[in-house]
Amino acid sequence: MSSNPSSVEKKLLHYTGKAIADFNMIRHGDRVMVCLSGGKDSFTLLTILNQLRIKSGNKFEIFAFTLDQAQPGWNDACLRQWLAEKSIPHEILTRDTYSIVKEKIPEGKTYCSLCSRLRRGIIYRYAEENGFNKIALGHHRDDLIRTLMMSILYNGDIRSMPPKLLSDNKKHIVIRPLCYVQEKDIITFASEQAFPIIPCNLCGSQENLMRKKVASLIDQLAIENPKVPSNMLHALQSLKPSQLMDQNFWNFKNLEDGLETAQSVQCEEVFNAQEFEFEDEKI
């Protein structure tokens, strides 16, 4: 920890440490691979985790992993120098996913989905081959609530980015220690630390990404009610299945069985859902 940490640094240490404790993200002896993209979020994550590692008495390891996806203009010289100065173990691995994305995705379409899928596969494989049992990503509070809003508006489901995730193949635990941290605090901290930010030119060239629209919408709502972002984060931790419509989580069809006056006899349904089906129906 810095000898005289700034107020925002103290705030980051507090909320990151709280998230780690709340969700048991890091245990004694864990080998944590921090995905360092070169952006403000991942630089902040690595810096704060390194300070917490020292604070813990080195009860866990951290390793910085950077994937060079062969994007035009990529220059990691400053990144390498920064990592060397911090004495943080690291590797910068080059894999040309850029050419694949440009070939597969038509001009004008968003690259994010394919790009992230390719990147995720490489990250998982590297972690497994090198014995890292935790993979740390730099998503913050605002990423979580924007993803929630995007899922509702554009995908028609309720999901976000969990603070701790077991991968589908059951081989990896992914953690998001910055899940309580506000983006504005990361911006302030990144400026204080003068991180050698490497911009993502691939994504930055697409001005009409859905995420930017949703971020703008949330910002507008927060002007009228500053509690909107924190309320959205709280909503992710306060699901009430009985107040929603998902029959996988609440037995709406047989609620009558819970009545104090419920009869033990099986009652026949008046209608069958198949009677009202239409082809390609979507309410």
Curated annotation (Swiss-Prot):
Keywords: 4Fe-4S, ATP-binding, Cytoplasm, Iron, Iron-sulfur, Magnesium, Metal-binding, Nucleotide-binding, RNA-binding, Transferase, tRNA processing, tRNA-binding. A motif (PP-loop motif) lies at residues 37-42. Transmembrane segments: none annotated. It comes from the Bacteria. Its EC number is 2.8.1.-. It is found in: Cytoplasm. GO terms for biological process: tRNA thio-modification. Homodimer. Catalyzes the ATP-dependent 2-thiolation of cytidine in position 32 of tRNA, to form 2-thiocytidine (s(2)C32). The sulfur atoms are provided by the cysteine/cysteine desulfurase (IscS) system. This is tRNA-cytidine(32) 2-sulfurtransferase. It comes from Legionella pneumophila (strain Corby).
